[in-house]
Structure formats: C-alpha cells, structure tokens
C-alpha cells in the first residue's frame, strides 16, 4: 500500500485522483486574472507553469509573482513547474539555469510542490530534491515523451528511477500512436501502483489518451490535469466535465 502524500490540505494517493489545473499567464496580471475562474471552480491543485512567465529568469520578479499567486489562491495547493523545451515547455535552459530557477522557487517560499524533471544531471537532481525537502516542499519528479509511448517495462523503469532519486510522487506522460499504446500506459501504471512505495501520476496525451485521464482510480494515477481556461498539454479535459466523470467512475 502506497503512502498518501500530504500536499497542503489534500492527499495524493488516497482514494479518487485529485484534480489539477494549469496557469499559463505570461505576465503577473494575466496570472492573477486566471485565479478568478479557478477559485470559482475549486480544483485541488493549481500548477503554475512558470516557463510561460516572461520574467521567469528574473529571481525577484519570479518570487514576487509566486508570492502574489500564493496569496490569491487561498488554501488551494500550488505546484510550480518549469517545463523545459525538450519536454514540451516554452523555453530551453541549460541544466545550471534550470536548477537555479528551481532554487529560486524554493527560496521564494510560495510553493507546496515542485516539479523536477528526472533527466537532468543526476547529482543536481539529487541536490534539488534534498533542498526541496529541507523547505518542506513535495517533489513531483517527471518525464514527458511527446513523440511515443515506451514499452511497459521502460515506463515502470523510469518511474522507479524517480522514486530512487527521492521523488515523493513520480510522474510520466506519453504520447500514444495507437489504442495499444494507451493500454501500455495503463498497464505500466497498474504495475507501478502495485510495486512502488510512492504514488504515481501518469497520462496518455492527446485525444486518443483522454481515457487515461479518467481511469486513475482504477489503474493507480493519483492526479489528473484538467482545464479552467487554457490547456497546458494535449488532451486535457475541462474541469467542469472531468469532475463529474470521475465521480461517475468512482470505486465503491
């Protein structure tokens, strides 16, 4: 039985998947404006995609924006993510720049969770995980394949590697080219749920993979990404639709 991970006032890995929505504003005004419909919708988690923020490489602007966002969100959990260009994000950074950004986020004291991409310099990954834990910040370690769906064993291997590197939650997103690819992702998720000591988040992207965003309670993914406004990845479903669909599919 995987332990549930406490994230502000929710738990990841217990019962039904929690719901996250992205904020992708490019300015602080855009970011704060996005919180109005989000507060009305009340997701469990907000993912702030800082790679969209035009001042992301300015440490003081980043910390100020994060602190204002934290205040605006009230008690909704905040996950802060810089998605690199190579994994589907907006900006290409060197490893040094990437980890400096992660450190700035931690120093800002505004986030409940930090996304850490697994496939960077291994020592630097371990160091940022340790730093996050010192700040009492949950680490969601991730890998995204926008071209294909690896084999079951490879997906499980990558998720296992994330746990080995100290992830509190391991996340894998893949792109299906066939129905069989979606089944591959779901099979790997079920194996990871049964064998790993930490919760996992998985998704098969695009329209073909939408079913994976509904099936977390059955197969073992603890967080599903929905939309209130702009999507941050292909295949995300509107929160107002996804929430009742998960309710209909709940296990009694």
Swiss-Prot record:
It is an enzyme of class 4 (lyase). Disulfide bonds: none annotated. InterPro entries: Aldolase_TIM, DHquinase_I, Type-I_3-dehydroquinase. Its EC number is 4.2.1.10. 3-dehydroquinate binds at residues 47-49, 83, 213, 232, 236. It catalyses: 3-dehydroquinate = 3-dehydroshikimate + H2O. One of its GO terms (biological process) is aromatic amino acid family biosynthetic process. Keywords: Amino-acid biosynthesis, Aromatic amino acid biosynthesis, Lyase, Schiff base. It comes from the Bacteria. GO terms for molecular function: 3-dehydroquinate dehydratase activity. Pathway: Metabolic intermediate biosynthesis; chorismate biosynthesis; chorismate from D-erythrose 4-phosphate and phosphoenolpyruvate: step 3/7. The active site is at 144 (proton donor/acceptor), 171 (schiff-base intermediate with substrate). The keyword Amino-acid biosynthesis applies. The keyword Signal does not apply. HAMAP family: AroD (MF_00214). PANTHER family: 3-DEHYDROQUINATE DEHYDRATASE. Involved in the third step of the chorismate pathway, which leads to the biosynthesis of aromatic amino acids. Catalyzes the cis-dehydration of 3-dehydroquinate (DHQ) and introduces the first double bond of the aromatic ring to yield 3-dehydroshikimate. Belongs to the type-I 3-dehydroquinase family. Homodimer. This is 3-dehydroquinate dehydratase. It comes from Lactiplantibacillus plantarum (strain ATCC BAA-793 / NCIMB 8826 / WCFS1) (Lactobacillus plantarum). The gene is aroD.
């Amino acid at each position: 039985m995987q332990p549930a991970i406490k994230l502000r006032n929710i738990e990841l890995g217990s019962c039904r998947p929690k719901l996250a929505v992205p904020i992708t504003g490019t300015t602080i005004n855009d970011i704060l404006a996005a919180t109005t419909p989000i507060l009305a919708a009340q997701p469990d988690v907000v993912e702030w995609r800082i790679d969209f923020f035009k001042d992301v490489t300015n440490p003081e602007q980043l910390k100020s924006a994060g602190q204002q966002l934290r205040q605006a969100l009230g008690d909704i959990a905040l996950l802060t993510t810089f998605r690199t260009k190579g994994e589907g994000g907006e900006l290409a950074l060197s490893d040094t720049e990437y980890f400096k950004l992660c450190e700035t986020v931690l120093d800002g004291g505004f986030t409940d969770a930090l996304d850490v991409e697994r496939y960077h310099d291994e020592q630097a990954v371990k160091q940022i995980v340790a730093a996050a834990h010192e700040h009492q910040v949950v680490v969601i370690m991730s890998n995204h394949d926008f071209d294909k769906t690896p084999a079951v064993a490879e997906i499980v291997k990558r998720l296992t590697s994330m746990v080995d590197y100290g992830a509190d939650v391991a996340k894998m997103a893949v792109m299906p080219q066939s129905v069989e690819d979606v089944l591959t992702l779901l099979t790997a998720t079920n194996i990871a749920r049964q064998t790993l000591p930490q919760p996992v988040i998985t998704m098969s992207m695009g329209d073909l993979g939408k079913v994976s965003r509904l099936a977390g309670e059955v197969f073992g993914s603890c967080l599903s990404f929905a939309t209130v406004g702009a999507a941050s990845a292909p295949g995300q479903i509107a929160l107002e639709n996804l929430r009742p669909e998960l309710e209909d599919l709940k296990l009694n």
